[in-house]
Amino acid sequence: MKHYELLFILKPTLTEEEVKAKVDFVKEVITKNGGEIATVVEMGTRKLAYTIKKYERGTYFVIYYKAPPTLLAELTRNIRITEDIIRFLSVKYENKREIAAWERLCKGIKQTIKKEPREPREPRAPREPKAEKIEEQTFSEE
């Protein structure tokens, strides 16, 4: 099986339930066609670099998965049919170096997700304003 990364952008107008349904749909297409999902990352809603289908923002997701090469055509077909996905990109990791990077990415993402949230810090005391230095100017008589 080959190693892949799928980045896709959903419309910003979708509700949380609709977003979850679309992500589950993509995951289902991958698993039904013989793929194994390593990890799913929600990158959040971000401003797009340029307007896509009249949207200036989008909700980003990245899915790292292993799958047979035949899955890519079926996945692409299903994503193109879905109107709520405004853009997608599939990346294939081929050589040993790229596969090792893929595994490090998946492992690193899983570790950051498992970390417990830190306790909030105590608020700091407000800083005193710095006094501006006023330099004396000397004028020479000419």
UniProtKB/Swiss-Prot annotation:
Q: Which residue ranges have biased composition labelled Basic and acidic residues?
A: 113-136
Q: Which UniProt keywords apply?
A: Ribonucleoprotein, Ribosomal protein, RNA-binding, rRNA-binding
Superkingdom field:
Bacteria
GO CC, one annotated term: cytosolic small ribosomal subunit
Please provide, alphabetically and separated by semicolons, the GO molecular function terms listed in this UniProt record: small ribosomal subunit rRNA binding; structural constituent of ribosome
Q: Does the keyword Membrane apply?
A: no
> Which terms under GO biological process does the entry name?
translation
Q: Which residues form a coiled coil?
A: none
Where are the annotated segments for Disordered? Answer: 113-142
Q: Which family does it belong to?
A: Belongs to the bacterial ribosomal protein bS6 family.
What does this protein do, in the record's words? Binds together with bS18 to 16S ribosomal RNA.
Task: State the protein's name.
Answer: Small ribosomal subunit protein bS6
